[in-house]
Amino acid sequence: MDGLGRDVQGEGALLRGQGEAVRVVLPGGVGAWAVTDPAVIRELLTDGRVSKDAYRHWPAWQRGEVGAEWPLAVWVSVQNLVTSYGAEHRRLRGLMGSAFTARRVGLLGPRVGEIAAGLLEGMEAAAREARGGVVDVRGLYAQPLPSRVMLELFGIPEEFRGALREIIEGFFATGVSLEDARRNYAALYRTMGELVAFKRRRPGEDLTSALIAAGSGADPADPGAPSDLADLTDVAGGVGAGGPEAPGGGGLSEKELVDNLIMLLSAGCEPTVNLLANAVVLLLREPGQLELVRSGRASWRDVVEEALRVEAPGANAILRYAVEDVRVGETVIPRGDALVIGFAAAGRDPGVHGEDAERFDVMRATRREHLSFGHGVHYCLGAPLARLEAEIALQALFDRFPGMRLAVEPGALRPTESFISNGPREVPVLLGPPTDGVR
């Protein structure tokens, strides 16, 4: 698979055409099975014989055949809610869910609107100064909006924010060198450790403080920031060791706290950036679809769901592992083999969405039948927040700039350099005359 993600959808279509489970080679020469069929994905993601815990269920990782030198090691070496399995996952999910409540998310709606309004003011000002009036909607709106929402949700002070935004963007780049991956992870771990220490001294009404409270009574020893990925196995408990012991009483250890904060923050930013950027491109490329919303025949929720389907913000999810032999159609995936779940390819499956599955259609009957937030026990905790942000942000943008158009041909847009993260690197637009934003 192309680590630079130069044609995520083309690669997905190729894999779909080759069967329900296809052998692939990941960046760095690691073999895996790619699964793109929606029905098969749903089965696998609810099958107890499929795990996300490399320390327990991936022999290649346990034996050191794949290790810290692998450029994608950070995706499997961290131990958090996303990479947990079984009882451990249920424990962490309960703790995360107790902090990431529907009430806390719901209260963010007005603040999302305020952040959007401020960013739109800034983008309009930037357009007045820009050559030809061209501005990048991704860089000036889609990227900072979810970042600011998450930074506020986490109660992150201003002095941490700039560094975290840069680090998180680098985290999703799968075409980077090993040295860059090591440096980025070390910086992320160090910064989040500093944040936890700050919040212990000055707790507030925020997600970080809530998770610290959930982990109270856990081992207070600070493992320190790993200097590079080679230190991850020691910090996490050693290759094959199963990771850190759960603290007494089922709380969070210091390592678990930092790892899960990293997971929540990164998962809450980059995918929503892609969702917003993709939706903007799709609407500007298909103005008839935007008119359906403006005429009241479709809603902004319809736009969000169809954008999630046709351009999944997370193209591929790595990795899962067969706990025992698993049959997929005529293929048997042997115990211990790794799997890649192709969410972007699944979203365009013609067997589910029709022969025009690649077309953006906000009235499509199957627009909600996507897997872009996952499925089963690992369904994304932040899905309600991502939907809330996208609906508010898209309506605010198109209400404010009803004449906005792409400044380049759609084919000239460059993808992010990743086969995991799926979205454009920039979205250059001409805003057109603004309105007062009231409709």
Predicted regions and their residues:
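Cytochrome P450
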Residues: M1-R439
